[in-house]
Amino acid sequence: MSGSTPFQMRLVHLDLKGAPPKVSYLSEIFPLFRALGANGLLIEYEDMFPYEGPLRLLRAKYAYSPSEIKEILHLAGLNELEVIPLVQTFGHMEFVLKHTAFAHLREVGSFPCTLNPHEAESLALVGAMIDQVLELHPGAQRLHIGCDEVYYLGEGEASRRWLQQEQNSTGKLCLSHMRAVASGVKARRPSVTPLVWDDMLRDLPEDQLAASGVPQLVEPVLWDYTADLDVHGKVLLMQKYRRCGFPQLWAASAFKGATGPSQAVPPVEHHLRNHVQWLQVAGSGPTDSLQGIILTGWQRYDHYSVLCELLPAGVPSLAACLQLLLRGGFDEDVKAKVENLLGISSLEKTDPVREGAGSFPGSNILALVTQVSLHLRSSVDALLEGNRYVTGWFSPYHRQRKLIHPVMVQHIQPAALSLLAQWSTLVQELEAALQLAFYPDAVEEWLEENVHPSLQRLQALLQDLSEVSAPPLPPTSPGRDVAQDP
């Protein structure tokens, strides 16, 4: 299958608010991105950006240094990947508003997600963030200013008072802040075009949107990560945006991080269907209105949620989706090319450790993560809840009272020790692989969430077995000092 893609720009989204890769791993993976068909990156730095001055407290423990940002941009340039930085400026501001120093700028005092658009200090804050990001991205042509999922907008005290005035609405409030931020970007760097996520714009009346001045300032990114995307609805939305005056639009799909907050390995078929439907949207919508597509790879649903699929685990899905976009479909030839590029035997494999992990950077992480996600909990469950000797002779009742028929120890202990040894070996290998690609806090978090609970259940069983099967201490007479000579 061959064909020209309607998406001239194909950007891979790097969501750094969880498990940010080390620069050394990015140096290995960027050439693969290019080989797969990407020509740009959307980098959502969040707390990994090296903010300075009063913003320094936003930095994560292992935030990139300015020199590392320059190295990332250099690596991207070597691989002909345009970098678009993303700075959240309205919703999803938890990484800023969680700090006491900025808590007074929350739209709703108890929730750190949304910025209060009425405070002049709010605009100064996002302006300072944008200044620092643009300073370290001197060649940036575009800047994504977020503005998605602005939850609880209109529910703060200042907003409630403002909304009591005639002709005011949450839509008007949203557009006003978006316009102010985008105008600030253009004032700072006239050559930079701001991008925004489109969800806060979708339901606004056309006349309000057209009259707001926003269409002359930003390019909206229409996002939908579902496998049953409403193609006709998206085409109508594109037509609406064009009528409102937006000259250029973008699409956003997903290659990972969109099928559950604790997903470990992306379901490739889901993501392929999502991209097939985006191709249908591009083919049916206004001609040449789509600048490109952003393949999002979310790493957390928000700042406080657990980690979803790690970047190496998402590479096969990303590869399949990029090649589908380039070739206009996903037949056996395209599938074979993806498998060849990644050095894997099959995209559908269920046991990469046995069938071959692949040759792409981080392929060993994918293989080991797949083993853990498919088999760790189920194997421990099988022992603790499916083994007749455990359920019949060493139940929670028995364990609490330290009771067991001595003969049963030999039926339970060897199996538990063998299972623990098997998983301990694999987990050591996984931890070593993770440490090469990620910082210590991400390694610790992933293992604590996905590995330790099951291993601790196994270790607790063995500890209880050890205690119950230990030889009893010799009895002593009540009140008699055992150390006393007869």
Curated annotation (Swiss-Prot):
Return the GO cellular component terms, semicolon-separated: cytoplasm; extracellular vesicle; nucleus
Q: What is its EC number?
A: 3.2.1.52
Location of the active site: E149
Task: Relay the activity regulation note.
Answer: Inhibited by O-(2-acetamido-2-deoxy-D-glucopyranosylidene)amino N-phenylcarbamate (PUGNAc). Inhibited by galacto-NAG-thiazoline.
SUPFAM superfamilies, per database record? (Trans)glycosidases (SSF51445)
Query: Alphabetically, which GO biological process terms does the record hold?
Result: carbohydrate metabolic process
Query: A single Gene Ontology molecular function, please?
Result: hexosaminidase activity
pH dependence statement: Optimum pH is 6.7.
Q: Where in the cell is it found?
A: Cytoplasm; Nucleus; Extracellular vesicle
Q: What is its main location?
A: cytoplasm
Task: Identify the InterPro entries for this entry.
Answer: Glyco_hydro_20_cat, Glycoside_hydrolase_SF, HEXDC-like
Inducers of expression = Expression is inhibited by TGFB1.
Which reaction is this enzyme known to catalyze?
A: Hydrolysis of terminal non-reducing N-acetyl-D-hexosamine residues in N-acetyl-beta-D-hexosaminides
The record ties this protein, via CDD domains, to: GH20_GcnA-like (cd06565)
How is the subunit organization of this protein annotated in UniProt? Homodimer; disulfide-linked.
What this protein is called in its record is Hexosaminidase D
